[in-house]
């Protein structure tokens, strides 16, 4: 029994099953590699599920398809396991059910009914709903279902439930949320029918209730039925509004009367423009929804979205806001998180940093689930054990201590190698030391990495050590993993070396205790030197965050940011929130061109709505002066010269590859690997995976 998380780690009865704790995973479809092109689950999916069952997830909900997908171009399909008849059962058992049951886990099948449906063998798969109403034009083409098709839909659902129970699933989830077929029937915004399935709320909920009742008849009284639905959907159309909380409070008892054993609440639809899952939303924010539903519900209530911190989960459970925590990203980040909760291992929890890489890939770009900011074991990495023991113990030199370097060091050590981790600065962390100033989520990841390094006896840390070829010769490693980070991209315009100009690299240098080179002006030069000395001894991300918010140096109250990619946008957001007048200048067509799809809309919207932010896309800087930035902007009318006033000019153009040390090591060491930004500049997920891969290759 957990003492730190007494409710989160406690069991809960849901009809005929007992959840071993209060942490369940919501449905997902991880895509290619996890499922074959002909929609059969693979060993990769089995390994993915087994990791989470072994990690003590109370209930794993997994998406499966109730129809045979025989008419879709294999190159344009998001693969799903199938449950259309008994022929699917052996694969479901081998690759989904048995890997979970092997560890005493529970697995719930969710028949896939989001937008697409295939009513019969002859009809192509496509989007269906109660009416031909689209919330977004690019997510349109909905076909209004006939009464005959509605009956076929129900029978297909009941058949899927029968197959899933026969296969050995422990529960079934009815998908009635996120803009799927059933949720479109429930919302007036997408249902303008005039028959028994349209009009009043009772009519619009009728199909969902018929599905639940029919599933209950198929599975029997003791088999749990979970219902995923969205009490608040944040959508509207000329036909009317979406669901309101007033509607939801009437719907919840109807669902229970029909046979719902557990409410699995989501928020919004796929078409919703409101930020739902990004770091703009605080952890546990959406529990106000479950708290309202609990006022009328007699069955347990789970709430999904933005649940990443077990301490927040526990507090919300203790406050009675929900009965079960539903989520997916916490499990993608750390498959063993529930076990660590039950064992009170808070320092060992690898928490989600809300980078949304998983969502951007799977949902926005229809890619497989291959990347996570903190967990390298996704995609092909699941095809082998996590830390295969090395056949020969090697002396491994890891140079650089960002996410690539530390993950490489920890992985190599776990495999049995002796690891020496070198860092030129006074503390570990690499670029995460700086990104933690902008993101408390990165700060907690940094804390996790430092804790793991400190705990591992096979990792020896060398701080304040600049590695040169001579260092390598003296160390005589069997293998070297070089993770020294990228080189800052140059910016050659008049005034780029002015005393009012700063760069992201300047801040990283200062955090590492080094005075950035070339700082002009006596006061300016003194401050950079003093700041570097101070931070070399007393730096913490939260302290630097507070100082950045309050201090007028080195960032004044009037800032121009050159470079509107992810680094510039994150810095711009900090400037916006701290009340600075901010200009973001970008040569490309869009500011935030490389920001992930999950974050970009909300981020750019916040810039547009802010009175203290101006964005300048298609704008080329020609000079920097002490008063600001001279630039040329391309418009429909032609090029236009601009002057953008600014007391501070921040250059955030990103990084270029940095192969110098890696190439110098190759004549000296048998095995040399370049990882992270020094090999290929990218996001934190790329660095994390590259470090892990290199260590596994030793």
Feature roles, as predicted:
Residues 339-346, 492-512, 663-676:
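A short, gly/pro- and small-residue-rich
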